[in-house]
């Protein structure tokens, strides 16, 4: 009898973290690798947030807090939703967890029974399907390639709904594509949802503040307040405030769900870090004037990467509205031989080829559920990004047509 549960047998470690691990190993060995695989901002946590954490330490704020998050932080989150999204939540409709990932995990653990279906547009963030599977749910994938602007249409959604559908996942702006749903697209999705009262929606808004070209961000509960009780909104401080390591995420939804998720959290991690919670209060309540400049900086990096990669004969690029990723179509290169005679058969082969020949780390598209693509993160310096993209271009140029 194996000591490892059968439930875990189909679950794999995060492929994006695997890329980072391999890259770090190569760097340690002295190889000049440029990493375009990590999904975190390259700017530092703002000083006022750091000072908020330091003050918490000096004040001895190092004890347990409420399992579901301290009231002061939940009030800051409540105020944020009202101020930025015009959505009203009560404190008992909000939960704070150790990162957005735990919020989502708690949600599915608390709400899914065996056989419940979760509609996941592909490409998707790598953790969605495995968290659904760990919660005994069934992921239902809907391919949304570059021809669909990487977004789920209302028609495709309706075709995917069955009597077993319990959740739909919407991630906007998206990881791995940066694609973002506008008002009309969300309204069309809401029209479908009004026909199917058994379908709930998880709206993952973690990249809310990283949008480009005057794109106007909307979240579903803001557009369809009549569906609010069926919508669970996930957000956090990781991306907008560059606090990935501080591990504070939050979610808002029905009191029934929050109560159930709190039970899950009480038997796993208990409360999020007290010091990080105080830092998050400062993030949400403090100055917000660095958010737009950081987004503009990301936009400049997007434009730089696009200007180079669009020149590559085998690539097709989508211009994302947000986040800090490009999801590049590369299937035209499949079947071609490298200069060493190796055939590139899929996105894994292609990512391996770039790592070995260009010395650039990217993530294969299959990791996000859609073959024929690769993802780069442009959350790095302009100099490193330009160098990496030129390396990719030159490496592909030597492959015979």
Swiss-Prot record:
Intracellular or extracellular location(s): Cytoplasm
Modified residues (N6-(pyridoxal phosphate)lysine): 239
Keyword Cytoplasm: yes
Catalytic activity: L-aspartate + 2-oxoglutarate = oxaloacetate + L-glutamate; L-arogenate + 2-oxoglutarate = prephenate + L-glutamate
Record carries keyword DNA repair: no
Cofactor: pyridoxal 5'-phosphate
CDD domains: AAT_like
Binding site residues for L-aspartate: 39, 125, 175, 375
Signal sequence interval, chain numbering: none
GO biological process: amino acid metabolic process; biosynthetic process
Recorded superkingdom: Bacteria
Record key words, sorted: Aminotransferase, Cytoplasm, Pyridoxal phosphate, Transferase
Cellular component aspect of the GO annotation: cytoplasm
EC number: 2.6.1.1, 2.6.1.79
Homology family: Belongs to the class-I pyridoxal-phosphate-dependent aminotransferase family.
Assembly, per entry: Homodimer.
Function, in words: Catalyzes the reversible conversion of aspartate and 2-oxoglutarate to glutamate and oxaloacetate. Can also transaminate prephenate in the presence of glutamate.
Protein name, per record: Probable aspartate/prephenate aminotransferase
